[in-house]
């Protein structure tokens, strides 16, 4: 088995990233993205100067992460947000996620972020333990995700 290496994604990685995004969505109980949506979002992110999509290769793409460094008024500083980190199920516990997070941390530091924010589902004990093993600390913040359709926002008067 090849030792994985991390590199910045290209548009040619869209299919592999889509497969990983589907795996993540299914694990979270979300609707999986379409290949076209992943391709379009990947193209957008690749154009963003303070956003990165990373892939881990080792006998194909075995993991991916995305991050962006953004100004954050709540923290008064730049924050690196990691909206996605996923490793193929059969390649977990082989150091792939750690390699991706090492590159995330390098890019965050290189771009003057003072904090890395990421989330893990409360029921995802494996992910929570992984992040703790890297030195991340769970906060007392409890987050609920609220969603609404932009084209057809929810009516606040409806139950």
Where are these regions (language model features)?
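Conserved acetyl-CoA-binding loop-helix of GNAT-fold acetyltransferases
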Residues: 87, 93-106, 129-133
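A short helix-loop-beta-strand connector motif used in the catalytic cores of GNAT acetyltransferases and
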Residues: 43-55, 81
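Conserved active-site alpha-helix within GNAT-family acetyltransferase domains
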Residues: 98, 114, 122-140
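Conserved beta-strand in the GNAT
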Residues: 55, 60-69, 81, 86
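Conserved GNAT-fold acetyl-CoA-binding loop/helix
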Residues: 19-43
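Conserved GNAT acetyl-CoA-binding A-motif
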Residues: 101, 108-119
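A short beta-loop-alpha structural element at the N-terminal edge
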Residues: 5-19
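Conserved beta-strand-loop-alpha-helix junction that forms the acyl-donor binding cleft
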Residues: 118-127, 145-150
């Amino acid at each position: 088995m090849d030792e994985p290496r991390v590199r910045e994604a290209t548009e040619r990685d869209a299919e592999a990233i889509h497969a990983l995004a589907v795996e993540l969505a299914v694990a979270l109980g979300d609707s999986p993205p379409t290949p076209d949506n992943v391709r379009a979002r990947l193209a957008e992110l690749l154009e963003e100067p303070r956003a990165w999509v990373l892939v881990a290769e080792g006998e194909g793409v075995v993991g991916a992460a995305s991050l962006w460094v953004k100004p954050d008024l709540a923290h008064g500083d730049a924050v690196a947000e990691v909206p996605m980190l996923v490793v193929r199920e059969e390649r977990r516990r082989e150091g792939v996620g750690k390699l991706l997070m090492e590159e995330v941390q390098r890019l965050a530091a290189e771009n003057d972020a003072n904090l890395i924010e990421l989330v893990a589902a409360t029921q995802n004990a494996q992910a929570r333990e992984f992040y703790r093993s890297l030195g991340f600390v769970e906060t007392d913040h409890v987050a609920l995700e609220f969603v609404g359709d932009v084209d057809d926002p929810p009516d606040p008067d409806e139950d």
